[in-house]
């Protein structure tokens, strides 16, 4: 089932997506007909194979995000940066080492892309446990980093089963940030 919204805009918003997996979140944005994914980064080769099937027109970069520079994104402008950095460092299913985990620095790599591209909006998703991890300090660091980069942020924990025909019962945190200069 595809839901689409007709747009009065002649130009779509450009998205650069990181930790893209198979591209499910991007698909939702594209189905609004308001957004176009101009760049995606995914390190896992099997996820990339599926991503290419779901998004054949998107430039897909398979490098480790540590090796990617903001200027590598093939677009004049990036309106939205989105990412769901790996959650094992914060998940109750993992060891919960947070920023001390080898994967825990990946938020800061996403932040590096945000700082370099200066998008008008950001969209981040992760496990709900990130909010309370390390007595809330992990989430505080993330909120402060985004706020210091001039983003007005709102966040909410949502369960996919409550929104449409999604076959999972899993709570996730969603963070939306708008560049303060873009907010009217």
Where do the PLM segments sit?
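S-adenosyl-L-methionine-dependent DNA methyltransferase catalytic core
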Residues: 1-37, 50, 145-148, 172-184
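Class I S-adenosyl-L-methionine
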Residues: 70-78, 88-184
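Adenine-nucleotide cofactor-binding loop residues
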Residues: 66
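The conserved SAM/SAH-binding core of class I Rossmann-like methyltransferase domains
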Residues: 41
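Conserved SAM/SAH-binding beta-strand->alpha-helix loop
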Residues: 44-45
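Short, conserved SAM-binding/catalytic segment
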Residues: 49-60
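Cofactor-binding loops of NAD(P)H-dependent oxidoreductases
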Residues: 63
């Amino acid at each position: 089932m595809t839901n689409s919204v007709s747009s009065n805009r002649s130009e779509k918003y450009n998205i650069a997506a990181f930790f893209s997996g198979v591209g499910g979140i991007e698909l939702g944005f594209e189905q609004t007909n308001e957004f176009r994914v101009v760049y995606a980064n995914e390190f896992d080769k099997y996820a990339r194979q599926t991503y290419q099937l779901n998004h054949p027109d998107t430039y897909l970069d398979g490098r480790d995000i540590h090796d990617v520079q903001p200027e590598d994104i093939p677009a004049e402008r990036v309106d939205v940066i989105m990412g769901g950095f790996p959650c094992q460092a914060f998940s109750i299913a993992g060891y919960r080492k947070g920023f001390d985990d080898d994967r825990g620095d990946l938020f800061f790599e996403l932040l590096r892309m945000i700082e370099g591209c200066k998008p008008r909006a950001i969209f981040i998703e992760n496990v709900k446990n990130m909010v309370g991890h390390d007595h809330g300090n992990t989430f505080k660091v993330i909120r402060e980093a985004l706020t210091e980069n001039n983003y007005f942020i709102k966040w909410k924990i949502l369960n996919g089963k409550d929104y449409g025909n999604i076959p999972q019962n899993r709570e996730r945190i969603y963070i939306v940030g708008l560049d303060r200069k873009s907010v009217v």
